[in-house]
Amino acid sequence: FSWLTNVWLGLNDQAPGALDRSLMGGRKTDVEPFGFEPMDSVLAAINEIDSKRASEVMHFYKEYLESMKNVANLVEVDGHVCYVVGNRTVKGHQLPTDQFTAWGFEQEGFEYVTTYLRDIPNKRMPSKNSPTNKAGKKVATMHKEYLVVLKKK
């Protein structure tokens, strides 16, 4: 997806897949606890099923946490961050991205304000899919989004 967009923009000096690998979550990382139990337990459960996929998910969240640190450094005291996230399902386990976002910013001196939950407007994906490619075995896709609001102390 990212590569095709770059071709259209004339920025296609990388091989297909190279850009995706360089973006957030594009590489693999050893699965290690963050110290945030809701995410740690889900990652451990995914790791028991598919260590390669767990490694990719771990890398995404490590880089996501790093991006939150970068944003936190730019926000002034009493400033707010508002992140719209979805809690996707991997290997049958829902990732608590909304809670992880709040926790990540709390580690950077923010206080949690609230989370607004709403249906995803104009959803273009089916409400269920079959990630295992086994007939009849379907799981729900994301149908809610979370607007997580925090304030810098």
Language model regions located:
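Class I S-adenosyl-L-methionine-dependent methyltransferase catalytic core
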Residues: 1-83, 87-153
